[in-house]
Protein backbone atom coordinates (compact mmCIF):
# COMPACT_ATOMS: atom_id res chain seq x y z
CA UNK A 1 0.00 0.00 0.00
CA UNK A 2 2.83 2.41 0.82
CA UNK A 3 4.31 1.99 -2.66
CA UNK A 4 0.99 2.84 -4.32
CA UNK A 5 1.65 6.60 -4.30
CA UNK A 6 5.37 6.35 -4.97
CA UNK A 7 6.54 8.21 -8.07
CA UNK A 8 7.06 5.89 -11.02
CA UNK A 9 10.63 6.17 -12.29
CA UNK A 10 11.38 6.23 -16.00
CA UNK A 11 13.91 3.84 -17.48
CA UNK A 12 17.31 5.45 -18.03
CA UNK A 13 18.72 5.47 -21.53
CA UNK A 14 18.27 7.19 -24.89
CA UNK A 15 14.91 8.02 -26.46
CA UNK A 16 14.31 7.90 -30.23
CA UNK A 17 12.22 10.36 -32.25
CA UNK A 18 11.27 9.95 -35.90
CA UNK A 19 9.32 12.27 -38.16
CA UNK A 20 9.14 12.97 -41.87
CA UNK A 21 7.89 15.71 -44.14
CA UNK A 22 7.65 16.23 -47.89
CA UNK A 23 9.38 19.40 -49.09
CA UNK A 24 8.82 20.93 -52.52
CA UNK A 25 12.51 21.56 -53.19
CA UNK A 26 15.40 19.50 -54.49
CA UNK A 27 17.35 17.32 -52.06
CA UNK A 28 20.49 19.42 -52.70
CA UNK A 29 18.70 22.65 -51.79
CA UNK A 30 17.29 21.11 -48.61
CA UNK A 31 20.73 19.69 -47.78
CA UNK A 32 22.27 23.18 -48.00
CA UNK A 33 19.84 24.35 -45.30
CA UNK A 34 20.94 21.48 -43.01
CA UNK A 35 24.70 21.69 -43.61
CA UNK A 36 26.40 23.66 -40.80
CA UNK A 37 29.22 24.69 -43.17
CA UNK A 38 26.81 26.25 -45.67
CA UNK A 39 25.95 29.95 -45.68
CA UNK A 40 22.44 28.74 -46.61
CA UNK A 41 22.05 26.85 -43.31
CA UNK A 42 18.73 27.98 -41.84
CA UNK A 43 20.18 29.40 -38.61
CA UNK A 44 23.03 31.18 -40.43
CA UNK A 45 20.48 32.65 -42.85
CA UNK A 46 18.39 33.82 -39.88
CA UNK A 47 21.43 35.75 -38.63
CA UNK A 48 22.45 33.53 -35.72
CA UNK A 49 26.20 33.41 -35.09
CA UNK A 50 27.53 30.04 -36.28
CA UNK A 51 31.24 29.66 -35.65
CA UNK A 52 33.41 27.10 -37.42
CA UNK A 53 35.54 25.42 -34.74
CA UNK A 54 37.21 22.81 -36.98
CA UNK A 55 35.83 22.44 -40.51
CA UNK A 56 38.00 19.40 -41.30
CA UNK A 57 36.47 17.50 -38.37
CA UNK A 58 32.99 19.06 -38.75
CA UNK A 59 32.83 20.99 -35.46
CA UNK A 60 30.61 24.08 -35.22
CA UNK A 61 29.29 26.28 -32.42
CA UNK A 62 26.17 28.42 -32.50
CA UNK A 63 25.27 31.32 -30.25
CA UNK A 64 21.59 32.29 -30.35
CA UNK A 65 20.91 35.98 -29.70
CA UNK A 66 17.76 35.19 -27.70
CA UNK A 67 19.72 32.87 -25.37
CA UNK A 68 22.80 34.73 -24.12
CA UNK A 69 25.14 32.63 -22.02
CA UNK A 70 24.35 29.42 -23.92
CA UNK A 71 26.31 27.75 -26.68
CA UNK A 72 25.20 24.98 -28.98
CA UNK A 73 28.00 22.66 -30.13
CA UNK A 74 27.62 20.46 -33.21
CA UNK A 75 29.82 17.61 -34.43
CA UNK A 76 28.94 16.38 -37.93
CA UNK A 77 28.71 12.59 -38.02
CA UNK A 78 27.78 12.07 -41.68
CA UNK A 79 27.49 14.28 -44.72
CA UNK A 80 26.44 13.00 -48.13
CA UNK A 81 25.23 16.01 -50.21
CA UNK A 82 21.64 15.61 -51.33
CA UNK A 83 21.24 12.29 -49.52
CA UNK A 84 21.88 12.43 -45.76
CA UNK A 85 23.25 14.62 -43.01
CA UNK A 86 23.84 13.87 -39.35
CA UNK A 87 25.33 15.46 -36.26
CA UNK A 88 25.50 15.29 -32.49
CA UNK A 89 24.52 18.44 -30.59
CA UNK A 90 25.14 19.56 -27.03
CA UNK A 91 23.97 22.70 -25.28
CA UNK A 92 26.10 24.34 -22.61
CA UNK A 93 24.95 24.91 -20.00
CA UNK A 94 22.35 22.16 -20.23
CA UNK A 95 18.82 23.41 -20.83
CA UNK A 96 16.24 21.38 -18.97
CA UNK A 97 17.12 17.70 -18.79
CA UNK A 98 18.60 17.12 -22.25
CA UNK A 99 22.26 16.02 -22.28
CA UNK A 100 22.74 15.65 -26.03
CA UNK A 101 20.94 14.79 -29.24
CA UNK A 102 22.04 12.71 -32.22
CA UNK A 103 20.22 13.95 -35.35
CA UNK A 104 20.13 12.29 -38.75
CA UNK A 105 18.31 13.46 -41.86
CA UNK A 106 17.70 11.28 -44.90
CA UNK A 107 16.66 13.01 -48.12
CA UNK A 108 14.69 10.90 -50.62
CA UNK A 109 14.26 12.47 -54.07
CA UNK A 110 10.70 12.61 -55.41
CA UNK A 111 9.16 13.87 -58.67
CA UNK A 112 12.36 13.64 -60.73
CA UNK A 113 14.30 15.41 -57.98
CA UNK A 114 12.17 18.56 -57.78
CA UNK A 115 10.95 17.65 -54.29
CA UNK A 116 12.01 15.31 -51.54
CA UNK A 117 10.87 13.42 -48.50
CA UNK A 118 12.91 14.37 -45.45
CA UNK A 119 13.12 11.65 -42.84
CA UNK A 120 14.39 12.91 -39.51
CA UNK A 121 15.63 10.58 -36.81
CA UNK A 122 16.86 11.78 -33.44
CA UNK A 123 18.20 10.02 -30.39
CA UNK A 124 18.09 12.11 -27.22
CA UNK A 125 19.90 11.40 -23.97
CA UNK A 126 18.41 12.88 -20.84
CA UNK A 127 19.78 13.08 -17.31
CA UNK A 128 19.31 9.89 -15.31
CA UNK A 129 16.79 9.55 -12.50
CA UNK A 130 13.74 11.08 -14.18
CA UNK A 131 10.25 10.17 -13.11
CA UNK A 132 7.98 8.86 -15.85
CA UNK A 133 6.08 12.17 -15.76
CA UNK A 134 9.31 14.15 -16.27
CA UNK A 135 10.37 11.91 -19.16
CA UNK A 136 6.92 12.27 -20.74
CA UNK A 137 7.29 16.08 -20.53
CA UNK A 138 10.72 15.93 -22.16
CA UNK A 139 9.47 13.61 -24.89
CA UNK A 140 6.60 15.99 -25.64
CA UNK A 141 9.00 18.94 -25.92
CA UNK A 142 11.41 17.01 -28.12
CA UNK A 143 8.62 15.77 -30.40
CA UNK A 144 7.44 19.35 -30.88
CA UNK A 145 11.01 20.58 -31.43
CA UNK A 146 11.63 17.89 -34.07
CA UNK A 147 8.42 18.80 -35.90
CA UNK A 148 9.16 22.55 -35.69
CA UNK A 149 12.67 21.96 -37.04
CA UNK A 150 11.29 20.21 -40.12
CA UNK A 151 8.58 22.86 -40.54
CA UNK A 152 11.24 25.62 -40.55
CA UNK A 153 13.29 23.63 -43.04
CA UNK A 154 10.22 23.25 -45.30
CA UNK A 155 9.33 26.95 -45.11
CA UNK A 156 12.95 27.96 -45.80
CA UNK A 157 13.28 25.64 -48.82
CA UNK A 158 9.87 26.44 -50.32
CA UNK A 159 9.36 30.13 -49.50
CA UNK A 160 12.71 31.57 -48.40
CA UNK A 161 14.27 32.77 -45.18
CA UNK A 162 11.98 35.81 -44.82
CA UNK A 163 9.01 33.46 -44.58
CA UNK A 164 10.77 31.59 -41.76
CA UNK A 165 11.48 34.88 -40.01
CA UNK A 166 7.83 35.98 -40.39
CA UNK A 167 6.47 32.62 -39.20
CA UNK A 168 8.77 32.69 -36.17
CA UNK A 169 7.77 36.26 -35.27
CA UNK A 170 4.06 35.44 -35.66
CA UNK A 171 4.51 32.47 -33.33
CA UNK A 172 6.33 34.57 -30.70
CA UNK A 173 3.71 37.32 -30.87
CA UNK A 174 0.90 34.78 -30.51
CA UNK A 175 2.54 33.37 -27.35
CA UNK A 176 2.88 36.88 -25.89
CA UNK A 177 -0.77 37.70 -26.61
CA UNK A 178 -2.05 34.41 -25.18
CA UNK A 179 0.11 34.53 -22.04
Where are these predicted regions, by residue range?
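A short, structured loop/turn motif at beta-sheet edges
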Residues: 24-28, 77-84, 106-117, 147, ...
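Short, surface-exposed coil-to-beta transition loops
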Residues: 16-18, 69-74, 98-104
Amino acid sequence: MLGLFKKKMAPDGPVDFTTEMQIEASPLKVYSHLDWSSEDHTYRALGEHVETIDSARGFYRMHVAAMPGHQFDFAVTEAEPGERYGYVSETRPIIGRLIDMQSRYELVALDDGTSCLVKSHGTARFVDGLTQHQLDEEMSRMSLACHNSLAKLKIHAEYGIEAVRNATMASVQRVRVES
